[in-house]
Amino acid sequence: MEFMGNRPFICCRRHALRLLLLAATAAVRPAAGWGQARPAPADATHRIQVDVPLLADDPVAVPLTVSVDHPMEPEHYVRSLEVTLATDPVPKKGTFLFTARSGRASVAYQMRSGQGGELTVVAECSRHGRFETKQTVRVAPGGCAVPAGTAARERGGSPSVRLDARVKPGEAVPVWASLKHTSHTGLVEKKGAFVREREPYFVERATVFLGDERVSEFLLTPAISPDPKLRFFVRTEAGQGLRVVFVNNRGERWEASQRLT
């Protein structure tokens, strides 16, 4: 028995081990508030749905739909969906921003993929932060590059927007927006490596307005397929004006509009 001051101090091995374990656990636990994405929670409202072919025949136009069946209310909604494919020459596949007026956090489009791999989709909830899911996609090679020496034609025009259903008060309505616009990454493949041969040409942003209110914005990359076509949702009332503004990476701008009925 040892003494500390005038009181006996008994060293218990079991108690000491327990303290060591608690200290080790605290040392490796991440600090709260880092903002890192975590695996999607088990509840249905925070489950990211990814629809992409396991094997895509055309690497220049891989169809992809990402969505979260989540409330879209002013105090609780999905702010964004971010798509990446880390193994690709152009890894960022798009960031899609939503508001409560979007009605549904969902987007469908076509992307380029150079070699496929593990697709990562990160969602951000206004109340619960970021969460993610992963899904494997396989593609034929060559979607992110053009043969060396090939001159890619560059042109854009003919924007369009159309509704996929009649407007019902308070419900999210599917919308298709498209633009005739060529695109390329500016990359060529030489000796097994991707090399930037010229500046890319692509649609880099599509912004959705109801009247003068911005309700969604889609930030695109050189991985967007030629002649982009996007499907998304809006929550609106009959009689409002819907506008979609496309802007490419050279600042050229196109606009399509439709009165909702």
Annotate each language-model stretch with its function.
Residues 125-132, 248-255:
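Short acidic/polar inter-strand loop motif in beta-rich domains
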Residues 36-42, 132-162, 256-261:
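Extracytoplasmic/periplasmic copper-protein system
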Residues 63-71, 174-180:
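Short edge beta-strand/loop segments characteristic of extracellular beta-sandwich folds
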Residues 1-12, 19-30:
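N-terminal secretory signal peptides
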Residues 80-84, 205-209, 245:
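Beta-strand signatures of extracellular beta-sandwich domains
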Residues 39-59, 152-169:
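N-terminal edge beta-strand
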Residues 114-118, 239-241:
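Extracellular Ig-like/FN3 beta-sandwich strand-entry sites
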Residues 101-107, 223-231:
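Aromatic sugar-binding surface patches on proteins
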